[in-house]
Design a protein with these regions (language model features):
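Ribonuclease/tRNase effector modules and their secretory precursors
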Residues: 1-92
Length: 92
């Protein structure tokens, strides 16, 4: 499936030294997927070494549109905060 990156996502990749391989691995083989009900996007999560990558994207006409992404070392804390307040709902 084709993948497009927003300017914002490309800037985050460059500034945060996110590896392209990590991005594609997260899209193809996520550990978890959440629906961000506040923004109408999907959020893929994948552990990569000691960090986790969080990737927000939309599916439009068969194209994956990556909106933003970042690494975190505090995944459990983030997921708890987002799911408890109902911002994210687990779909996978």
């Amino acid at each position: 499936m084709p993948v497009q990156f927003s300017r914002h996502a490309l800037e985050k990749i460059r500034r945060r030294n996110v590896k392209t391989a990590d991005v594609y691995a997260t899209l193809k083989f996520p550990d978890e997927v959440y629906e961000d009900v506040e923004h109408g996007t999907l959020v893929a999560v994948k552990k990569v070494n000691a960090k986790s990558i969080i990737l927000a994207y939309k599916m439009e006409a068969g194209v994956v549109k990556v909106i933003t992404l970042y690494y975190t070392t505090k995944l459990d804390r983030l997921l708890k905060a987002k799911t408890v307040r109902g911002a994210w709902k687990r779909v996978k």
